[in-house]
Amino acid sequence: MVKFEKVPILGKESIHVGYDIHTDMVQTIINDCRSSTYVVVNDTNLSKVPYCQDFVQELRSSLPEGSRLLQYAVKPGEANKTRSTKADIEDYLLSKGCTRDTVIIAIGGGIIGDMVGFVAATFMRGVRVVQVPTSLLAMVDSSIGGKTAVDTPLGKNFIGAFWQPQFVLVDVKWLETLPRREFINGMAEVIKTACIWNGLEFERLESNAELFLRVVNGSKVIKVNGLSTGEVNDIHYTNIEAMLEHTFKLVLESIKVKAEVVSSDERESSLRNLLNFGHSVGHAYEAILTPQALHGECVSIGMIKEAELSRYLGILSPTQVSRLTKILAAYGLPISPEEKWFKDLTLQKKTPLDVLLQKMSIDKKNDGSKKKVVILESIGKCYGKSAHYVNDEDLKFVLTDETLVYPFSNIPQEQAKTIVPPGSKSISNRALILAALGKGTCKIKNLLHSDDTKHMLTAVQELKGASITWEDNGETVVLEGHGGETLTASADPLYLGNAGTASRFLTTLAALVNSSSKQDYVVLTGNARMQQRPIGPLVDSLRTNGTKIDYLKSEGSLPLKIYTSTPFKGGRIELAATVSSQYVSSVLMCAPYAENPVTLALVGGKPISQLYVDMTIKMMEKFGIKVEVSTTEPYTYHIPKGQYTNPPEYIIESDASSATYPLAFAAMTGTTVTVPNIGYESLQGDARFAIEVLRPMGCKVEQTANSTTVTGPPTGSLRPLKHVDMEPMTDAFLTASVVAAVAHDNDTDSANVTTIEGIANQRVKECNRIEAMSTELAKFGVATKELPDGIQIHGINSLDLLQLPSNSTGPIGIESYDDHRVAMSLSLLAGMVNYSKSHPAADIKPVRILERRCTGKTWPGWWDVLHTELGAHLDGAEPLGYLSGKKTKRSVVLIGMRAAGKSTLGRWCSQILGYELCDLDVLFEKQYAKGTVKDFVAEHGWDKFREAEANLFKETVEQYGDGGYVFSAGGGLVENEVSREHLKKYASDGGVVLHLHRDIEETIVFLQSDPTRPAYMEEIRDVWERREKWYNECSNFAFLAPHCSNEKEFQHLRKSFANYITAITGNREVQVPNKRSAFVCLTFGDLTEKASVLPSIVRGCDAVELRVDHLAKYDSQFVSKQLSTLRTATNDLPIVFTLRTKKQGGKFPDEDYTGMARLFDVALKACVEYIDLELTLPIDVQYKVSNTKGYTKIIGSHHDFGAKYPWKDPEWENRYNQALSLDVDVIKFVGTATKFEDNLALERFREEHKSKPLIAINMGEIGKISRVLNPILTPITSEHLPNSSAPGQLTLAQINKIFASMGGITSKKFFVVGNPVSHSRSPVLHNTGYKLNGLPHHFDRFETDSAQVVKETLLDGEPSLGGLAVTIPLKLDIMKYMNQLTDAARVIGAMNTVIPLGNHHFKGDNTDWIGIKHSLTSNGVPEKVSNVAGLVIGAGGTSRAAIYSLHNLGCHRIFVINRTVSKSIELRDSFPQEYNVVAAETTQQIDHLNEHIGIAVSCVPADKDLDTELLAKLERFLHKGKHNSFVPTLLEAAYKPDVTPVMKLAHDKYQWQVVPGRELLVHQGVAQFEIWTGAKAPFQEIFNAVTRD
């Protein structure tokens, strides 16, 4: 049991720390803070915690006579840490007669402590306060030191005071109920205080991380009974007692640090700002990522960034950064904003560099605009006594993963530097394996602290191979080996990142591992690249020797499952070693522990990298095992059985491969660099680099047994190396390549060629390094040629010829391929660009290196050395994608079965997006050049075709993925695993992979009659069933294309597909309504049976809800068909996809999370406009949907069917905060009204919660009024539905009538004005809409030919005027009375709509053009056309609206014909030039046109015959009617007769589709209706009413 401790602060022992000390806390308050009134303030969540209830009860029962206890609960969450909440508390205190002797007890986390402390500081000019912190963060940070504050809209903690509490009573028992994430969040501050002040405590924290995480991860939710209410509540429970000593100690030590610092600097003038380590950067991240990211999580990232800054400035060692990184990760905290789990948690939010710097600029530590950061000197010690000024350039560097390298021309040639590279990766990994297998304690010094060795150390610990501790402030690893006796299978897979060395060494080591009681295998896995790298020869060898190993994914690569029940037998082992020497070293090191002595024979030719094999043998000898080289067989070794004996100390040589970079820097810049611990006695082959590569190229090289010094020749005078065999030092070829790029001689015949060979293994390293260097050197203007086992580099003749990497759009980045050696070598070449050019500093363009952090694999501090020690000018850079701000034209890949519609929809897709269409089968046939796909299959077989098809797809999508193409792929592309990987990668990188599918029965019927394609070798249904899962896993979108049997159905499909494709490509965004709106709820089992009635059901709605849980079947194909049916039947009304679970009032099984995830995936691929996401679902389900939502909006919903939670209950506040943290787009709360006052409480809740659009309603008869008052997306029913989906639902008309009766909708009067208007259909049109929608308005006629009369009588004289429809002769005359004109009215030059703006101001509009457009688009013309010309017949007023409309549709040219040619010319000249209006003057002119006319609008009188000349022109144009994506369409502007002569001619003689003028009449009136009322018009009912006679 831990003891009770008191910690002094500011000269008083006022901080008490213990476990289960509530009695001591009560006595301290009663005895040392005597008062007539004690006030406990906590949040409503804490009121549910039994320990809080016990504490308050004990305090109440212990009160002395004459004292009273009050308790006040505030709403939880940062959103309530406001001046308003503070005022509420103060009003409560005043109402209860609290005076100056009041003692306030703040029980809670930092929010409560900060706010209640501020109340105490100001109430009655200051009253006493006792802090009782309940969160880890509050215990160790916010409760200590007297800082108090509330938030403001402009920032957190901007208003507050220093007010020291009487006591801080810290009982770690509170932590039992702290949620897991909050617990881990608090550890950031604990680690921070140890990091800046207490190195010993940091070490203790390091050694207890595993225990902490195990206990905290075991946190669970339990049910407890409330003492006062009897309610059963869910709370978190963590078994603190399982780590009590550690928890108590970490809290106590952290408090001691803060107390000591505060005592020295209470008001944060100097020393106290050291406590802000990690906060300068952390607060900037928090400002962007809140509320998804917690304070401690952001501070954790901030600590890493600020530590990296310290390292970058040459103050902090890389080892110390590594220790900090490890401990934060070990306690479950993020170490980078790019970690996948953290990105998912923060919903993929971006953290732009300029925003981070701007947020940092308002840090309280700053001096004006100068930023200050706490600099760490070592673990446990800060650099100086306060924060330091830092410049933006250095900050930008550490904040980004892209770096700008400026020319090295600032570096003086006489510069001489000594650089010590980190420990050798090769030696470090070997030493760890040998020491883990060895017996005894070994102190390993100069170990490389990198990703590779981190994975190796973790694996050794997971396999229980050794005990690992640290000395010398983390610089020395102390490894106590157990002689291989304790090796045990780990429960979890060993993740090795991209650590190739670790993966190969551990593969053989795993064969020595013992089975545990629960597991008899070890799984090795890694990242995506690691899962492509070869390990086959080693696995083959071990399998042959008796070890059972399974490939879990791809043959020949990780992940591997290595069975521990099959022993490593030993004896003769044959191994192919032409790919990697690491296979050899892996077997060599483990061979002494085989059952029998090992004879290792390397077969298949000369082994690669023999020197690394020699290195392993020498190191084995140091650990006590001597390997004998066979004298009778080449490349054969005899290894005896035995056990390694660990030497007391082993010093790792610096990495010779890494040493090549500073030495090459000297060579290229003409400076001098010494590497003091690598010479000719080195174990590493790369130590030869200076002698064998740099010296022949013109450098002065001095090498001793243990040091190497290089002095470069004058800059620009390096010589090519005609030929070098780099087989002994293959990793150094990249460095040699960049040196060769700037090498030239005076021999005109040599072409400055440097030939490097012996490096074939470099193709299977972290990337294909030979290809990577060839690709990236080309960006600098350096030519190369790949050789079978090497590369030729054609050096440039002058440094001036070295190019800045760029393309037609500007500078581009240098790719690193996630390869440390690629990045480091190319950083040297980058500094030589513009080296000798004299430009003003502002004009010098740097070279951008991408993924700079990949150097962490072997030299995390490389950039620090390049900048701080070698003097290079570096800067950080925002990723180019952030900077452009442009939408890229990401190509669309169509996949799916034959006959799924890829050809037709592919053509439509290309036209809608303006992309190029490319059929991959056609492209294949072009490249094959010997016939069709069918011919290729006949000659080579399907497997060869699939292989060739995969290569073609990879090359095509890599080259043209951003080029704006629609790629139509063959149905079987997904049959090939390589193709599937490329498809998935393209989708994950932001490309569109669209699966087109249709009913399989229809597909079978079609395919059985298609002779043009190679025949399936099996049943079509079997093919579909095999491929279906592949189509699903490879695609990120899916569209079901129903079979179309007539032109009308094709029109519906095309329109639906156009809406879909523009949505998934980001060209059409879902707009959440900001006005009164509604959606109808559908609960049918099968919509296909109700398709005919759906248009009536959704009348007047802004969206339609599909209750998927009510469907007859939940299979994906069925649900997809329902969505397709709904889209078609409702004219693509936005869909709300709702999967309501049983406990939230629906029918879907509560625990079927797999089925739920599958159906949400269907919805997201279908790009539904809204997904209803229940806030009670598991967090992983919620985050999966939130992180993959794409362009879909999320409605976060919560329902209370049992009337369990009044609107004041914290349940709603907690759910609201949860919805905010999920960053949903709309919040939907549904309560149940048991009394009318519940509706008033709901409205108060709505008024106080405006951060997000909120749907809030009460169910039941009493709650109907809440549906009327709800402002957006109100769920409604319809008179055409058999029943409503929820109790109390109303129709849209009912809602509007009730709302109008309450004064919510003011009755308006509307008129049609002009002369004559007696036969106008406008009153019928509008009044029908008002009646059906339940609106209180009335539309009438006002006949006059005087605009003046309209102004006096209606514009000035009618107070309830809602709008005017204007007809002849007033369309021009009334314009002078308008205060504003829309663009349409201005360009057309006439108006037909008056819109009141208030205060006797009016806007003039013209909806004729909308009527024209909607008449066309509702009959199959796309919303946007491409390569289509339009025709307008006539030159009157309607013709102007027609031209405006055709231009809006996208017609690239608009022809006008008219009886009087001069009128056509006059019309043409009145429009802007970009409209491209052409007056067709003669028939001969038309004959010579090479245009296809797709759309025509007839604006000539329908009651007169066309004159001969006009008719001749019209017929010529109609003859040119053609468009391959829609039927040529003519709209008649005249309302009567139903069929005009122009319509008859176009339809009967030229097969045009014709649209009667009544559609134009209704569409333009409906546009007016929606402008005036803001409501959706019931189009079909209005159309029927208008055209009835």
From Swiss-Prot:
Reaction it catalyzes: 7-phospho-2-dehydro-3-deoxy-D-arabino-heptonate = 3-dehydroquinate + phosphate; 3-dehydroquinate = 3-dehydroshikimate + H2O; shikimate + NADP(+) = 3-dehydroshikimate + NADPH + H(+); shikimate + ATP = 3-phosphoshikimate + ADP + H(+)
Entry function: The AROM polypeptide catalyzes 5 consecutive enzymatic reactions in prechorismate polyaromatic amino acid biosynthesis.
Transmembrane segments: none
Gene Ontology biological process terms, A to Z: amino acid biosynthetic process; aromatic amino acid family biosynthetic process; chorismate biosynthetic process
Sites where the protein binds ATP: G896, M897, R898, A899, A900, G901, K902, S903
Location(s) in or outside the cell: Cytoplasm
Family the entry assigns: In the N-terminal section; belongs to the sugar phosphate cyclases superfamily. Dehydroquinate synthase family. In the 2nd section; belongs to the EPSP synthase family.
Catalytic machinery residues: E268, H283, C854, H1199, K1228
Residue ranges of the region described as Shikimate dehydrogenase: 1307-1589
Name the record gives this protein: Pentafunctional AROM polypeptide
Annotated binding of 7-phospho-2-dehydro-3-deoxy-D-arabino-heptonate, by residue: 125, 141, 147, 157, 189-192, 258, 272-276, 279, 295, 364
Residue segments, region 3-dehydroquinase: 1082-1294
InterPro entries, A to Z: 3-dehydroquinate_DH_AS, Aldolase_TIM, Aminoacid_DH-like_N_sf, DHQ_synth_AroB, DHQS/DOIS_N, DHQS_C, DHquinase_I, Enolpyruvate_Tfrase_dom
Residues binding NAD(+), per UniProt: 43-45, 78-81, 109-111, 114, 134-135, 156, 174-177, 185
Pathway info: Metabolic intermediate biosynthesis; chorismate biosynthesis; chorismate from D-erythrose 4-phosphate and phosphoenolpyruvate: step 2/7; Metabolic intermediate biosynthesis; chorismate biosynthesis; chorismate from D-erythrose 4-phosphate and phosphoenolpyruvate: step 3/7; Metabolic intermediate biosynthesis; chorismate biosynthesis; chorismate from D-erythrose 4-phosphate and phosphoenolpyruvate: step 4/7; Metabolic intermediate biosynthesis; chorismate biosynthesis; chorismate from D-erythrose 4-phosphate and phosphoenolpyruvate: step 5/7
Subunit and interaction comment: Homodimer.
Gene3D superfamilies membership: 3.40.50.1970, Aldolase class I, Dehydroquinate synthase-like - alpha domain, Enolpyruvate transferase domain, Leucine Dehydrogenase, chain A, domain 1, NAD(P)-binding Rossmann-like Domain, P-loop containing nucleotide triphosphate hydrolases
GO MF term set: 3-dehydroquinate dehydratase activity; 3-dehydroquinate synthase activity; 3-phosphoshikimate 1-carboxyvinyltransferase activity; ATP binding; metal ion binding; shikimate 3-dehydrogenase (NADP+) activity; shikimate kinase activity
Region annotation (EPSP synthase) ranges: 405-872
Enzyme nomenclature, EC number: 4.2.3.4, 2.5.1.19, 2.7.1.71, 4.2.1.10
Cofactor mode of binding and number, as noted: Binds 2 Zn(2+) ions per subunit.
Cofactor: Zn(2+)
PROSITE patterns, sorted: DEHYDROQUINASE_I, EPSP_SYNTHASE_1, EPSP_SYNTHASE_2, SHIKIMATE_KINASE
Annotated organism of origin: Zygosaccharomyces rouxii (strain ATCC 2623 / CBS 732 / NBRC 1130 / NCYC 568 / NRRL Y-229)
Residues binding Zn(2+): E189, H279, H295
Lineage of the organism: Eukaryota, Fungi, Dikarya, Ascomycota, Saccharomycotina
